[in-house]
Amino acid sequence: MTEDTQPLFHTHTHDGWTHTHMAREAQTAPAEDLRIRGVVLPDGEERELWVHDGVLVEGPLSGARTLADGCWIIPGLVDAHNHIGLDAHGAVGTETADEQARTEAKTGTLLIRDAGSPSDTHWIDDRDDLPRVIRAGRHIARPKRYIRNYAAEVDPENLVAEVDRQARSGDGWVKLVGDWIDRDEGDLAPLWPADIAQAAIDRAHELGARVTAHCFSEEAPAQLVDAGIDCIEHGTGLTDETIATMVERGVGLVPTLINIETFPSIAAQADGKFPKYAAHMRHLHAHRHETIAKAWDAGVPIYAGTDAGGTIKHGLIAS
């Protein structure tokens, strides 16, 4: 693309996990037909692509301008765990959210699975220069058991109702906080009783939504996978037994390895007051590659996600 044009994206497919997009040039004059020739990834086949009005079409097209020849052609990248409209302190304004989304587009991300945000970003759907977004509504957590200003905070008896609410405000996903530090126990612990978690997941499924959950520990993902959850975020505590059940049920995993690199600094902050938690976080970090490799080798569906937003900067999916 030339420097004075902006990318616009046309959605071709959507199954809840993936989109396929085609970038085109934004022009005030009628869009010209384009020809692109190169090696198309991931197949590695050299092909000619023809673009009419920003959309891939069957060619050839008479009079089409060659936009690129002898190049590599790749689809837009997908960030399966991202947070548009969120920073370290909670919800951000539209201007900041716009900047976050533009950063993702400039670095190649054309589809974002937003894994929880306190901001309403549906205005992005009307912007052709920004990535498409599949939203999970707002995180759902218990009071004082997650990052301040991030989540809809409810007690367990109100979880099903909150899942109902977030399922209706999202785009087919609901995001639970599966575990967090329990300050009374001094370590990671699940947020939800198993029976209530299962009832909440069942309600989401009744509404046609899938459920995913933030999980660092061993206990929470085991409980939630048994309860019928569709995906696990982070997954540093996955055991062999949990992995086997995930494979059997087709449960996805988004490891967010960029986020997991922060575990040592989190542990260092907890050393004095919560030594058990600090040691646990260091253990999870030390075994992160082994754990994710086991899930991969077993056949768990794994998706790339950065956890951008909050304290992780945007535009890192290629990393």
Q: What is each of the regions a protein language model found here?
A:
Residues M1-G63, W72-I74:
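N-terminal metal-binding scaffold of metallo-dependent hydrolase/deaminase domains
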Residues P75-D87, A204, V211-F216, I232:
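Histidine-centered catalytic micro-motifs
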Residues P7-H21, T94-A209, V251-I260, I266:
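Divalent-metal coordination cores built from histidine and acidic residues
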Residues D226-C231, V247-L253, D271-G272, G299-P301:
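Glycine-enriched alpha-helix->loop->beta-strand junction motifs that scaffold or abut catalytic
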Residues T256, F263-H280:
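Active-site loop ensemble at the mouth of alpha/beta enzyme cores that anchors a bound cofactor
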Residues G85-D87, P118-W123, A141-P143, W180-R183, ...:
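Active-site environment of divalent metal-dependent phosphoester hydrolases
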Residues E206, H285-S319:
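His/Asp/Glu-enriched, well-ordered alpha-helical/loop segment
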